[in-house]
C-alpha cells in the first residue's frame, strides 16, 4: 500500500515521499524496509533516526531536520493512529461459519441473525444470542444468559447462568464470567457453610475481559462492569463489586468483594483492593499498590516496594525488625525533650525572661562532684 494512501485513510499530514510502498507495521527497533513504525514518546527520537523502517507516524509537533532520513505521517495522537494503521494490514482468523454440527444448542435458545457457534460449544436453555454474536469452539454458555449484538466469546470460556453481556463486548480465551463468589459462614463446629451465590454478573457495552480473568457473581444483586471498561488477563473481580465506565484494570489486579471502582480509573499490574472500599473517579494506582482504605477522586497512588539488591534488602530487613524498639526509644526521647522545654513554655506565659533549665549531669567513670556553674 502506498504511503500516500495510508496517510489519506488515517487522516495524517504526509511529509516526504508518498510513493513509498508499505507492507506492514513494526516497532522502531524491529522494523525493516517496507515497514511503517511510530513514535509517541520523544525520548525515542534518536532510535527513530536509525530505524530501518520506510516511514514513521510521529506527533504533529515533531521536530525533524531538513535531512530527516525517512517520510513522516504527522498526527496529534500518534499512538491511536498507530492502532488504526495496524487494522489496515491485520487479517483476523476466520470466525466460525454458522452453527458447527458438533455444537449443542438447547431448543429454547434464541439465536439472532448471523450468529456463529464453533465446534463443541454448548448453548444452554433460554439463552439469547443477539445478531452477530460469535461463540468460538469449546465454550459453555449456561442457561438464561443474554449476549448483546456483535459480542465475541473466544474459545474455552464459561459464562454462567443468567449473566448479561452487552453489545460489542469481547471475552478472551479461558475467562470465567459468573462463577460463585467466595462466600462462607462459619458454623458452631468451626466448619464453613457455603452461602448460595444467587446474584449475577452484568457486563455493559464495549467491555473487554482478558484471558483467564474471572468475574464472580454476587451473593445477592449483581457484579457489574460498566461500559467501555477493559480488564487485562488474570484479573480477579470479587462478588458484588462494581467497575465504572472506561476503567482499565491491568494484569493480576484483584478486587475483593463489594469493591466500587469509579470512572476512568487505571489500576496497574498486581494492584490489590480490599473489600467494601470505594475508589473515586480518575484515580491512578501504580504497580503493586495495596489499597486498604477508600480513595477520593483524582488521586495518584504509589504503594509498591521496588526490588533492590540482596545486600541492601537484608540491611533494610534488619532495620525493619528493630522498628518497635526504635519507636519506643523515640517516644522516650520525646518525653525528655518535652520536660526540657517546659520551663521555656512556663516563663513565656508569665512574661519572665527565659532561663536555661537546670539539667543534672551524670558523669560516668569519674569521681567528685560535677562542675558548678
UniProtKB/Swiss-Prot annotation:
Q: Segment Disordered: which positions?
A: 345-373
Q: Which UniProt keywords apply?
A: Acyltransferase, Lipid A biosynthesis, Lipid biosynthesis, Lipid metabolism, Repeat, Transferase
According to its UniProt entry, one GO biological process term is: lipid A biosynthetic process
EC numbers, comma separated: 2.3.1.191
- Write down the Pfam families for this protein, in alphabetical order: Hexapep, LpxD
> Could you say which enzyme class this protein belongs to?
transferase
Q: So where's the catalytic machinery, residue-wise?
A: 239
Q: Does the keyword Magnesium apply?
A: no
**Gene Ontology molecular function: any one:** N-acyltransferase activity
Checking InterPro entries in the record gives: Hexapep, Hexapep_transf_CS, LpxD, Trimer_LpxA-like_sf, UDP_GlcNAc_AcTrfase_non-rep
Gene Ontology CC terms, in alphabetical order:
carboxysome; membrane
Q: What reaction does this catalyse?
A: a UDP-3-O-[(3R)-3-hydroxyacyl]-alpha-D-glucosamine + a (3R)-hydroxyacyl-[ACP] = a UDP-2-N,3-O-bis[(3R)-3-hydroxyacyl]-alpha-D-glucosamine + holo-[ACP] + H(+)
The source's domain of life comes to Bacteria
The record, for PROSITE patterns, names:
HEXAPEP_TRANSFERASES (PS00101)
Pathway membership, UniProt? Bacterial outer membrane biogenesis; LPS lipid A biosynthesis
Protein purpose: Catalyzes the N-acylation of UDP-3-O-acylglucosamine using 3-hydroxyacyl-ACP as the acyl donor. Is involved in the biosynthesis of lipid A, a phosphorylated glycolipid that anchors the lipopolysaccharide to the outer membrane of the cell.
Subunit structure, interactors included: Homotrimer.
Q: Which family does it belong to?
A: Belongs to the transferase hexapeptide repeat family. LpxD subfamily.
Kindly provide the name given to this protein in its UniProt entry: UDP-3-O-acylglucosamine N-acyltransferase 2
Q: Which gene encodes it?
A: lpxD2
Amino acid at each position: 500500500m502506498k504511503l500516500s494512501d495510508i496517510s489519506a485513510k488515517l487522516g495524517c499530514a504526509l511529509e516526504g515521499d508518498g510513493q513509498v510502498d508499505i507492507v506492514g507495521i513494526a516497532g522502531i527497533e524491529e522494523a525493516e524496509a517496507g515497514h511503517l513504525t511510530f513514535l509517541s514518546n520523544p525520548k525515542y527520537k534518536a532510535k527513530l533516526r536509525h530505524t530501518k523502517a520506510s516511514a514513521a507516524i510521529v506527533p504533529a509537533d515533531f521536530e525533524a531536520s531538513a535531512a530527516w532520513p525517512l517520510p513522516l505521517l504527522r498526527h496529534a495522537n500518534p499512538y491511536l493512529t498507530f492502532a488504526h494503521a495496524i487494522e489496515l494490514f491485520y487479517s483476523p482468523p476466520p470466525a466460525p461459519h454458522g452453527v458447527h454440527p458438533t455444537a449443542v444448542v438447547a431448543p429454547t435458545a434464541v439465536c439472532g441473525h448471523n450468529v456463529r457457534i464453533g465446534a463443541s460449544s454448548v448453548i444452554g436453555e433460554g439463552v439469547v444470542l443477539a445478531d452477530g454474536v460469535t461463540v468460538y469452539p469449546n465454550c459453555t454458555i449456561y442457561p438464561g444468559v443474554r449476549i448483546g449484538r456483535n459480542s465475541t466469546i473466544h474459545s474455552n470460556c464459561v459464562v454462567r447462568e443468567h449473566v448479561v453481556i452487552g453489545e460489542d463486548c469481547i471475552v478472551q480465551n479461558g475467562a470465567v464470567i459468573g462463577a460463585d463468589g467466595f462466600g462462607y459462614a462459619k458454623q458452631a463446629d468451626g466448619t464453613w457453610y457455603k452461602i448460595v451465590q444467587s446474584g449475577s454478573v452484568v457486563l455493559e457495552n464495549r467491555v473487554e475481559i482478558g484471558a483467564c480473568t474471572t468475574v464472580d457473581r454476587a451473593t445477592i444483586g449483581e457484579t457489574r462492569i460498566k461500559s467501555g471498561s477493559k480488564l487485562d488477563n488474570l484479573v480477579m473481580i470479587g462478588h458484588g463489586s462494581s467497575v465504572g465506565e472506561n476503567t482499565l484494570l491491568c494484569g493480576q489486579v484483584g478486587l475483593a468483594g463489594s469493591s466500587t471502582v469509579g470512572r476512568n480509573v487505571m489500576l496497574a499490574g498486581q494492584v490489590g483492593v480490599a473489600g467494601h472500599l470505594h475508589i473515586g473517579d480518575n484515580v491512578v494506582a501504580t504497580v503493586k499498590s495495596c489499597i486498604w482504605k477508600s480513595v477520593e477522586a483524582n488521586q495518584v497512588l504509589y504503594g509498591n516496594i521496588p526490588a533492590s539488591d540482596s545486600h541492601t534488602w537484608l540491611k533494610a530487613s534488619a532495620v525493619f525488625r528493630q522498628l518497635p524498639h526504635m519507636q519506643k526509644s523515640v517516644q522516650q526521647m520525646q518525653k525528655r525533650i518535652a520536660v526540657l522545654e517546659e520551663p521555656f513554655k512556663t516563663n513565656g506565659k508569665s512574661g519572665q525572661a527565659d532561663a536555661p533549665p537546670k539539667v543534672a549531669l551524670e558523669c560516668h567513670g569519674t569521681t567528685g562532684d560535677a562542675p558548678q556553674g
